[in-house]
């Protein structure tokens, strides 16, 4: 009887410990490109910031299988969470890909994939933002 109770207790402890464990947050390197899906975030080594790709707020880029007068623009929304708290939201543009300054770092949009096609509409979860954080 005591052995069975001990076994159940050990199993219960193992379940609690495993439930408390969470996968390690991915870490991006300063001055190197990293790719995020909508909703994903990463901490950036050598800084006190976490960058989260909120999503694409609008994509008016000219589809690859269309003829357009203008190239258009896509707006990538990111959230920067310093370790001290208080998130700040920034909109990065594909047409004017200027980095934004957040305290002592710059966040730049390098690329937004996939490129739109008229024949293949892009779903919000399909986007991948390639970003870079520099000093």
Descriptions of predicted regions:
Residues 40, 47-49, 72-76, 88, ...:
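Envelope-exposed proteins and targeting segments
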Residues 17-20:
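C-terminal motif of bacterial Sec signal peptides marking the signal peptidase cleavage site
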Residues 22-25:
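Bacterial signal peptide processing site
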Residues 50-93:
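Mature extracytoplasmic domains of secretory-pathway proteins
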Residues 2-9:
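Positively charged n-region of N-terminal signal peptides that target proteins for export
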């Amino acid at each position: 009887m005591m052995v069975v109770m001990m076994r159940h207790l050990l199993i219960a402890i193992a379940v609690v410990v495993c439930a408390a464990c969470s996968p390690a947050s991915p870490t991006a390197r300063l001055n190197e490109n990293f790719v995020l899906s909508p909703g994903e975030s990463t901490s950036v080594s050598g800084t006190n910031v976490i960058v989260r790709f909120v999503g694409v707020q609008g994509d008016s880029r000219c589809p690859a299988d269309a003829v357009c007068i203008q190239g258009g623009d896509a707006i990538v929304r990111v959230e920067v969470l310093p370790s001290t708290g208080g998130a700040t939201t920034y909109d990065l543009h594909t047409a004017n890909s200027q980095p934004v300054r957040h305290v002592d770092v710059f966040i730049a949009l390098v690329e937004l994939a996939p490129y739109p096609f008229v024949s293949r509409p892009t779903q919000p979860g399909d986007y991948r933002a390639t970003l870079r954080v520099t000093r």
